[in-house]
A protein has these predicted regions:
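Short helix/strand-bridging catalytic loops that position acidic/His residues to coordinate divalent metals
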Residues: 54-55, 165-166, 194-199
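Acidic/glycine-rich beta-solenoid
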Residues: 1-119, 136, 154-162
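A motif-centric feature for acidic-aromatic and gly/ser/thr-rich catalytic loops and repeats
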Residues: 107, 115-180, 215
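Short beta-strand segments enriched in hydrophobic/aromatic residues
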Residues: 78-81, 133, 167, 197, ...
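A cytosolic small-molecule/anion-sensing beta-strand core signal
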Residues: 30, 49, 125, 185-187
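Short turn/helix-capping motifs enriched in Asx and small/polar residues
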Residues: 136-150, 172, 180-182, 186-234
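Flexible loop/turn segments at secondary-structure boundaries
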Residues: 44, 54, 63, 130, ...
């Protein structure tokens, strides 16, 4: 039976796509790390000793490579897609692209270092970056999220920090958020690797996002979920 519903993602959004329609579309290693996602055309994912991805390889030969510090902090990402190579270096709160300073991250936004201009996030109660405005108040980007972080519509796409303020990588249809301790697939509502703090959450899936309760909780870093507190002034 085929679902006759129209697409649920519009204007820059993303959604789950059953790209191959096979019985086994996902493969995991003995540590529980995702090593293959046929729906995204990912043929292999290799990992380091911290169960962080070293290399993502697509069926057409495109790759995404990661470099980390000893504590697991991401230092570099190299996208090789077709004939184009893009290198992103992370030096504290300064982001370089192909060796050129690009962004200076701040608590409430970022500075584009090519022109020294400030850009500000307008966030919702979950810390999701819903709107980006420049220092004149002009809207540069707007994002509309499903509860689990999928984007059903967006405009602008001027910067990568979106749901929960996490870095989103949509290149080559990867569509993953980097939570630090592990990657998150919002189209599935699941992380790609086992929770390193699994012994604290024995009553839920090791891959579930914030205990399957994205309305009342957020995940801070792939290790720890937190309740959302909303106060009303009487």
């Amino acid at each position: 039976m085929d679902d006759a519903a129209a697409a649920s993602a519009y204007n820059g959004g993303f959604e789950f796509k059953d790209g191959v329609k096979q019985a086994n579309e996902y493969t995991y290693d003995s540590n529980g790390n995702l090593t293959k996602d046929l729906n995204k055309g990912i043929s292999t994912i290799t990992y380091n000793v911290l169960n962080l991805p070293n290399m993502v390889t697509f069926s057409d030969g495109s790759t995404i490579a990661y470099t980390y510090g000893a504590d697991g902090t991401k230092l570099k990402t190299v996208h090789k897609i077709g004939s184009t190579t893009t290198t992103t270096d992370y030096c504290g709160n300064v982001i370089y692209e192909n060796g050129v300073q690009k962004l200076l991250l701040t608590e409430e936004g970022y500075v584009t270092l090519s022109d020294g201009k400030y850009h500000y996030y307008l966030k919702d109660h979950q810390g999701n970056n819903r709107v980006v405005i420049n220092q004149s108040g002009t809207v540069e980007e707007a994002n509309h999220y499903y509860p689990f972080g999928g984007v059903f519509a967006s405009s602008g796409n001027v910067q990568p920090y979106k749901y929960n303020g996490k870095e989103y990588d949509g290149k080559k249809g990867l569509n993953l958020y980097d939570y630090g301790a592990r990657m998150y697939d919002a189209a599935l509502g699941r992380f790609t690797t086992v929770d390193p703090s699994a012994e604290n959450y024995f009553n839920t899936s090791l891959y579930a996002y914030c205990g399957n309760n994205p309305i009342n909780r957020i995940d801070l870093d792939g290790l720890l979920l937190a309740r959302i507190l909303i106060y009303k002034v009487l």
